[in-house]
Amino acid sequence: MAIKKGELMNNRGKLELKKMVVAAMFVALTVSLSGFSIPVGTAKCFPVQHMMNVIAAVFLGPVYAVLSAFVTSVIRNIMGTGSLLAFPGSMVGALLCALIYQKSKKLWACYIGEIIGTGIIGGLLAYPVALLLMGNAKVATFTFVLPFLISTCGGTLIAAILIGIMDKTKVLDYLKRQIR
């Protein structure tokens, strides 16, 4: 089997080089903007991560959206600019909004998926992370839901504005075609 330009091969099939490069650029952009955070309660609220979750979901699909969220969380933790709470929120939000967008092709559904995935499901999954991995026995089950909701609503709103502009100017479809 020959390797075509723009593709890499692994034991499961092909990985698209363009998607990998775009995902890496999204990670770099997200990490470089990690200084923009809003402390709310016990969590670092980071709207840029949620904005990039939505953008990665729309452009890259579920696998690369989740990988982008994971790699961003790892790098931010290594740099000391993130916390372990970033993993459940960002990855679940990226997965849910990407799966919903993949099935429906509706942007509004993607936005709702990010808010539910990060704000509610990710907020609830942050509780065992805080309790078991961070040793914080004082947190309650719903401690992280409100801060995560605030953060994801802000990031999703920014993404909706950017994607809306790209959609109206036909840039969205053009960029999607370039990545495929």
Write out the residue ranges for each language-model feature:
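Loop-helix junctions at membrane interfaces
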Residues: 1-180
